[in-house]
Amino acid sequence: MWNRGRIVSLMRTVSSGSCSCPAHSRPVAISQQTSCSAEKDTAFEMSSSTIRYGPGVTRELGHDLQNLGAKSVCVVSDRNVLQLPSVKVGLDAIVRAGIEPVLFDAVRVEPTNESLQTAIDFARSHRFDAFVAIGGGSAIDTCKVANLYSADREAEFLDYVNVPIGRAKEVTVPLKPLIAVPTTAGTGSETTGVAIFDHKPLHAKTGISSKALRPILGLVDPLHTLSQPEKVAAYCGFDVFCHALESFTAIPYTERGPAPANPKLRPPYQGSNPISDVWARFALQTISRHFRRAVYAPDDLEARSQMHLASTMAGVGFGNAGVHLCHGLSYPIAGLVKQFIPDGYTGAHPIIPHGLSVVMTAPSVFRFTGASCPDRHLEAAGILGADVAKSHRNDAGAILADTVRRYMHDLKIENGLSALGFNYSDIPALVKGTLPQERITKLAPRAQSEEDLAGLFEQSLTVY
């Protein structure tokens, strides 16, 4: 068995070689994240898509498109989702409005640069005046990207992709209206200006982030969630879980710097703030009451409705505050998938569902960050059901970690990274894949060295 020193030694050997890859050529970025002496920001912004929530609101989709004056509408989904009765309601509503939808049904669960390029090519081959995304986060993110690149037909794929993998070009072209209809209670993508994908050339998870990508409307219809299989409900629910915990424990917005020279340059992920905290607390309270029921009682409309609402609320929260280490560590986990094929997911290709990749490291992450903001860790644990009345602040990280672990055990989540096919020898590559995620890892309340990251992955090989 390898010890941590051996892992770090190998990781440093790999990182120190000559490498022109933009994702892997900045091995000291994270350890230097607090060295900036620039002026800190003193303001935060709150923005979100318009949200309409309620059972059956999908029936109103046709009217919404009519109100936009839309004539040519691209509907982005996948073949399996389009067969669901609740989704057919939305398609029928579009047709009743006198609009013939043009379907793109080749969405890949956990999109890649290749699957996104297919969607881009499809969108560019038409002249749509509106987009509709129906499905989980994969469908909504694919639709956002198709909308962006069909608006800027000369753009190369990496132009808008986040640095260091892409060029993070500012979005200045006007996008078409996009309406999102989420069918899972997880990503909150209907509220955010973020699209995430696997960049296969580097085996790395990355994304595109711009307020311009936000849907103009999210139709949050909990009837869609009744079709979620048990494992899908669990994995998606843990994405909500970590969105709320990470945004609530992110650095305060006043600790983020530098202050933007122009307010339009203020990043979407700004750090925890009083308004995002409201959404995070609401989501955690809802999770405490309804998460287990929503997974194990698929016909429980109340529980699944509440988790769908929690997904949206957490999305509003993290869409403005940000996420940090659980998500930063999750990207190489998903990008370096081996042969894991989860229950409840259609398609034969190996994937690690996003929510699963995120929660795998959550116990080790919150144990690591607990000392940096103990009061918030204890408050979160208390909301989630832990008895914190006589707890000491020094134990905050361990208490929240144990609380997360209990939820994972109750909902039968796989026992750590080893259950997904990873071992000690993979840790250098996992660390290396985390380094490009500084955009979000720098929002963690505690800075991380490469050795810290290796330790977090090592501790996450088993959870129970």
Curated annotation (Swiss-Prot):
Cell compartments where the protein resides: Mitochondrion
Protein name, UniProt field: Probable hydroxyacid-oxoacid transhydrogenase, mitochondrial
SUPFAM superfamilies: Dehydroquinate synthase-like
Function: Catalyzes the cofactor-independent reversible oxidation of gamma-hydroxybutyrate (GHB) to succinic semialdehyde (SSA) coupled to reduction of 2-ketoglutarate (2-KG) to D-2-hydroxyglutarate (D-2-HG). L-3-hydroxybutyrate (L-3-OHB) is also a substrate for HOT when using 2-KG as hydrogen acceptor, resulting in the formation of D-2-HG.
Annotated transmembrane regions: none
Catalytic reaction(s) noted: (S)-3-hydroxybutanoate + 2-oxoglutarate = (R)-2-hydroxyglutarate + acetoacetate; 4-hydroxybutanoate + 2-oxoglutarate = (R)-2-hydroxyglutarate + succinate semialdehyde
Family recorded in the similarity comment: Belongs to the iron-containing alcohol dehydrogenase family. Hydroxyacid-oxoacid transhydrogenase subfamily.
Biological process according to GO: glutamate catabolic process via 2-hydroxyglutarate
Single GO cellular component term: mitochondrion
UniProt keyword terms in alphabetical order: Mitochondrion, Oxidoreductase, Transit peptide
EC id: 1.1.99.24
Pfam family, one: Fe-ADH
GO molecular function, one term: hydroxyacid-oxoacid transhydrogenase activity
Main location: mitochondrion
